[in-house]
Amino acid sequence: MVERLASPAAHELDALTDLWERSVRVTHDFLAPEDIPFFRRMVRQEALPAAEIYVIRDSGNGFAAFEGIGADRLEMLFVAPSARGKGLGRELVEHVAVHCGVRRVDVNEQNAQAAGFYARMGFRIVSRDALDPSGRPYPILHLER
């Protein structure tokens, strides 16, 4: 069941950041290891506090998956490695598409699994940037549906 986290507490933001890192270490093999601490700080200090957060909890009341949105854009979607392949990502994306009007997402070009996931969800590439927003050499695909 999708739940909106209104005003997440610091311990919840920490738990989401930990989930982010576990997920990234499995799915973002193209990242330079030294970039992970930089992005982790950015996620915890900037991205999560700025986003409207939706979660799916695991059986122990922790987080199995989460997404963050801003306006009509999906800003982030991460699933715990142990919860991958169970439809949680699809459930989260469909929830915010229906209830929040989300229709845009950016994805790392090197993340073929995520690009394929979004293509199966009906997203199409509308543009590409050679660098990510922090100026690093991780091309970004801008998708819409």
Q: Which residue ranges define each predicted feature?
A:
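Conserved beta-hairpin
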Residues: A51-E67
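Conserved acetyl-CoA-binding loop-helix of GNAT-fold acetyltransferases
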Residues: G85-V98, G116-R120
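Conserved catalytic-core motifs of GNAT/GCN5-like acyltransferases
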Residues: D106-N108, R124-I140
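Conserved GNAT acetyl-CoA-binding A-motif
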Residues: V98-Q110
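A short helix-loop-beta-strand connector motif used in the catalytic cores of GNAT acetyltransferases and
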Residues: R44-V55, R73, R136
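Conserved GNAT-fold acetyl-CoA-binding loop/helix
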Residues: D18-R44
